[in-house]
Amino acid sequence: MKRTLDIGVLLSRSGMYAALAYASRLGVLQGVAEVNADHTLDVAFRVVERDPEGRLDRYAPLCREILRDSQARHIFGCITSASRKEVIPELERFGGVLWYPVPYEGFEASEHVAYMHACPNQHLIPLLDWALPSLGKRAYFVGSNYIWGWEMARIARERVAAAAGDVLGDRYIAVGDTDLDHIIQEIRALKPDFILNSLVGDSSYAFLARLAELKQEAGFQSGLTVLSCNFTECEVESAGSAAEGLVSAGPWFEPEGGSGGSFHEIARQSVHELAKLLHGRPGADVLPLSELVQSAAGSGHTPRLDPTNLHARQPAIIARLLNGRFQEIKRLPPLAADPYLTRQFGASHDGPLLKVVS
């Protein structure tokens, strides 16, 4: 007999990054359907859903509403780091857990967040370590004007400098802004070897379109390779042919050319992971996340999350978009997350790096 538990879903169906949220939402709902149909598990999930509509000011109130007005203690959602940081105080207030299934910039370890996707040592560092010897050392950074863009550029600047490279430009625009003339003009003048694109949603699609136009000009048929740690298959349709040639890093790419990418797949896996952590353990859904992970490990399940920092071990895959599909260039075996980059320049340490404390 299955016991049914409420889980929250906090993902936007509209707004400037709707394609990302749409893929994640479908992944959550697929995971719920699979768990509910799995007779080897004694848990089933009932979805309590709220739509923030891509508006930052709605995330915290809607998170509070889910935790206050339902039995849900585990919420799947948030796309931007800004929205994740908005809900953490509500998770702390009500003892909830956010299952965060998208890449982020690191430098965080909350006992109320399950970081299921990749952090910089699992995406940005491997991507730059491939790009600098392969493409050249003249870099240009462009990003959305919030913590994701800022931190990705900061980490990348350190890595490029360590490789004796040059950062030719580091520019930011507001999330959703598509006024890119000044950035395209600067890229035209500087001719970087590669561009780290940390723009989100509509801003990214507009940038790729403008850059594709620049590449048609004389003298720009080579170089200007775009690198990304957050562009997946779920955005190919929105970006169109302008994204061709983009090189992305992440833990998973569609093997058969699907459209969900890692945003869909990691969201789906996250639902399964929670179900396995709760299987055979009535009442465990109210445990603190670190205790839930540690106790599940003691009962024979090998959790995806590291109990010391609540980040998942993930492979690092580098792939290039060609003819609308990502083709793998390089793959690293699953890497333990190092959210504070204590090993980023080669220091070796096999023991726990970080303990989550309240």
Positions of the model-derived regions?
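Extracytoplasmic "Venus flytrap"
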Residues: 4, 8-29, 50-54
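Extracellular glycoside hydrolase catalytic/binding regions
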Residues: 96-126
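An alpha-beta-alpha
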Residues: 116-171
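Extracellular/periplasmic periplasmic-binding protein-like sensory domains
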Residues: 211-282
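Beta-alpha junction/loop-to-helix N-cap segments that form part of ligand/metal-binding clefts
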Residues: 24, 39-106
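Periplasmic-binding protein-like
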Residues: 69-79, 99-101, 140-141, 191-207, ...
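Short beta-strand elements in bilobed, periplasmic/extracellular small-molecule ligand-binding domains
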Residues: 38-54, 110-112, 160-177
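Segments of small-molecule ligand-sensing domains
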Residues: 275-350, 356-357
